[in-house]
């Protein structure tokens, strides 16, 4: 199956997010983050957005930057922000099975080869959010 995705980078690796779940991409000063109940949040005008740092989730050292790149993702009626190092753009990808070592791990939906020939893991948005409840 072909899946429209948004490619994002965390550390040296590229990951694919299903485009249907992407609401918007924000850039916010790192100093604008707040904390609620032990979790990072971003105060928006109309609501507070819970954040998941993809780099921390993956165990990758974050690139220190005064400006955060946040991909806002939809999960059911809720939204959350995924902090990434950079957004690489949209790409339609062919979904392939996960490598054996990653099967059954929460947060991964499949794998794909992207335009530059590298493998990118397709992230399961529900699995990423699952650790926040």
PLM region spans:
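Conserved secondary-structure micro-motifs at functional edges
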Residues: 1-133
């Amino acid at each position: 199956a072909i899946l429209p995705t948004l490619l994002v980078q965390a550390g040296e690796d590229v990951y694919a997010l299903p485009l249907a779940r992407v609401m918007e991409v924000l850039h916010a000063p790192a100093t604008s983050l707040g904390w609620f109940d032990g979790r990072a949040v971003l105060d928006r005008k109309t609501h507070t957005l819970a954040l998941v740092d993809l780099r921390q989730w993956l165990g990758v050292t974050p690139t220190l930057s005064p400006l955060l790149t946040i991909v806002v993702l939809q999960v059911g009626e809720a939204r959350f922000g995924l902090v990434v190092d950079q957004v690489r753009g949209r790409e339609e990808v062919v979904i392939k099975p996960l490598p054996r070592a990653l099967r059954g791990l929460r947060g991964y939906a499949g794998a794909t080869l992207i335009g530059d020939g590298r493998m990118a893991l397709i992230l399961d948005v529900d699995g990423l959010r699952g650790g926040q409840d």
